């Protein structure tokens, strides 16, 4: 390809990317981060932890903006003036108010106290991510690749998407046709090494837009007040005396 043609093609790509970015709204979310002192010491001090946290949030932002799957540009910004190192039980940090921030992220690489229960997303007015690893007495870095894949998944909850893996149906528990359903490919199904948001996740995140949301409220809000079921014969004519049975499926 001639050099002038190559330059023109590259310029066109840059202009197209800039136009797309300009056409999309930017949603900025302020994040307060706390980490346990033992992890800071194990990782080499505060400056090193700041660097690792910056790298982690670059990956979080990339996950939300990769491939322009969503209608907006997402920017999760750590407030470094509010960044803190805590002592004691990490579970005590989760429910602390953070009125000046959209989200609180509590990291814990040494989860050994019995009160330090499972990590994950805490919604319903708490708006916090408990970013902790295996419950044992050894150090588990919250900055490993799989750990960051996990926190991307938790930010998916923060933006309104429920666990897709919780919707799976085992074949022996499907009384309709006996088929299994394992869920679709998505960060919200199996996040490790995954970059794709499913169509369902994209629609939920887009629906949440720039609001701070609770998953249950968001899901309930998109359902109609009434659902009408029509039953037809093979020739598409309305069936008479049809019986419709609903089989509830509990999540998890």
Task: Annotate the PLM regions.
Residues 1-10:
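Bacterial N-terminal signal peptides that target proteins for export
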Residues 12-22:
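Hydrophobic h-region of N-terminal signal peptides that target proteins for export
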Residues 23-147, 250-252:
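Propeptide-to-catalytic entry region of secreted or membrane-anchored zinc metalloproteases
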Residues 60, 64-68, 155, 159-163, ...:
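Sec/Tat-exported extracytoplasmic proteins
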Residues 144, 148, 163, 180:
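Residue-level marker of regulatory loop/turn positions in helix-turn-helix DNA-binding domains and
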Residues 149, 154-172:
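Catalytic Zn2+-binding segment of zinc metalloproteases
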């Amino acid at each position: 390809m001639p050099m002038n043609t190559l330059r023109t093609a590259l310029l066109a790509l840059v202009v197209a990317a800039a136009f797309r970015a300009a056409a999309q709204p930017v949603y900025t979310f302020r994040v307060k981060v706390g980490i346990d002192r033992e992890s800071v010491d194990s990782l080499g001090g505060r400056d090193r932890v700041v660097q690792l946290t910056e790298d982690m949030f670059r990956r979080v932002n990339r996950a939300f903006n990769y491939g322009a799957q969503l209608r907006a540009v997402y920017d999760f910004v750590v407030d470094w003036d509010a960044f803190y190192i805590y002592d004691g039980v990490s579970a005590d940090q989760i429910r602390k108010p953070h009125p000046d921030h959209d989200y609180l992220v509590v990291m814990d690489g040494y989860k050994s106290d019995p009160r330090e229960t499972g990590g994950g997303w805490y919604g319903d007015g708490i708006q916090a991510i408990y970013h902790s690893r295996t419950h044992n007495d050894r150090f588990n870095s919250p900055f490993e690749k799989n750990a960051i894949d996990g926190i991307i998944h938790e930010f998916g909850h923060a933006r309104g998407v429920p666990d897709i893996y919780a919707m799976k149906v085992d074949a022996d528990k499907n009384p309709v046709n006996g088929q299994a359903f394992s869920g679709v490919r998505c960060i919200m199904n199996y996040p490790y090494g995954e970059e794709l948001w499913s169509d369902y996740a994209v629609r939920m995140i887009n629906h949440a837009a720039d609001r701070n949301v609770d998953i249950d409220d968001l899901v309930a809000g998109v359902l109609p007040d009434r659902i009408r079921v029509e039953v037809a014969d093979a020739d598409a004519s309305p069936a008479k005396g049809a019986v419709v049975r609903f089989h509830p499926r509990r999540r998890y």
